[in-house]
Amino acid sequence: MNINENYLNLKDSYLFALVAKKVSEYKAQSPGKEIISLGIGDVTLPLAPAVITAMGDAVAEMGRGATFRGYGEYQGYMFLREAICGYYGKKDVHLDKSEIFIGDGAKSDLGNILDIFSTDNTVLIPDPVYPVYVDTNIMAGRKIIYMNGNTENEFLPLPDGGIKADIIYLCSPNNPTGAVYDKDRLKLWVDYALENDAVILFDSAYEAFVRDRELPTSIYQIEGAKRCAIEFCSLSKTAGFTGVRCGYTVVPNELTRGVVPLNELWLRRQTTKFNGVSYIVQRGAEAAFSAGGYAQIKESIDYYMENARLIAEALKALGIWFAGGENSPYIWLRCPDGMSSWEYFDALLTRANVVGTPGAGFGANGEGFFRLTAFGDRDDVKKALDRIRNI
């Protein structure tokens, strides 16, 4: 028996697991210290009342013989797919319900979508980058080419005509940098993909945090994107579903390679390897897209974005360069005093008892930078900022 030796090419530990390990070790060495995390992007506010009510009603349904439900539809219940179609319609993006696949979060689908692509495809990935994009392709043994994100291009890499790629990862608003592609720059990627017969895997998990109405919140707002892009979205940060688990993937019927519709390939993959998201969770997700539910969710988003404003204000006062925080819950800052990413991590942890995420963990171009998130409790955020000011 042979193992998949590609796994041996992975880093020893997933970035956020490594951060958690270091924090745990520090706590053991310094008992009684109050640690405040502005690091991993988990939410802190509870689910919206409309979501709780819908899930409670669904639980009651499951307790009655007449309304009990077993296995659900492979693509997700029609009521949720219809709600998502309505949500996209407000963006002037028209989807068919057959193009929407309900899953347990963007992370899973971003990794699993690779099942429908050959392992000899060349993958183009931005650097800095969410580690899942890299690790899942290393696991499969694909060739990876990195495109440089830096202060000169505002951490928004653009196509290089001299590079030929088959699969392209884009995330906007970006994790970790908080940068957001405008329509003109995103159109350059769509044109590149169409010219090179490539497929864009577009992570829009943070689209609900975009406040500038001129910025796209779906790649399908760009002409031609339905012929070259798959979009992944999640309710984790938008609706507080990090522990509930629900997201969706859009695979347009227009998207084919050769004569093969990728929608059919993904459906075949899902019917074989995935049994769907629970009815109770999907009813909660449906409520999140209702008028009343979304208004409640918007209050949570506004709360987190006020946290982002406070973080940005503090960094400005300290003279620290940063990006993000305006249309994204992430703030990407340059480490002060020439410190490396992990040196700044250690300084914040030991001197301020504050946790963030070292930029180097997101790729070589992240060295010297650091990510803070706006998902904390307001009082904790204020306390953390006071500590940062005082070191």
What are these language model-derived features?
Residues 2-104, 112, 288-291:
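N-terminal small-domain helix-loop-helix segment of the aminotransferase-like
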Residues 19, 38, 55, 84, ...:
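Generic structural signal for small/hydrophobic residues in well-ordered secondary structure
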Residues 30, 140, 195-196, 318, ...:
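Helix C-cap/helix->beta junction micro-motif
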Residues 46, 304-305, 318-351:
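Conserved PLP-binding catalytic core of the aspartate aminotransferase-like
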Residues 66-193, 207-222:
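Conserved core of the PLP fold type I
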Residues 86, 94, 338, 347-357, ...:
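PLP-dependent enzyme catalytic core of the Aspartate aminotransferase-like
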Residues 221-302, 309, 313, 391:
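Conserved core segment of the aminotransferase class I/II
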Residues 282, 286, 301-312, 322-334, ...:
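Conserved glycine-rich beta-strand-loop-beta hairpin in the small C-terminal domain of fold type I
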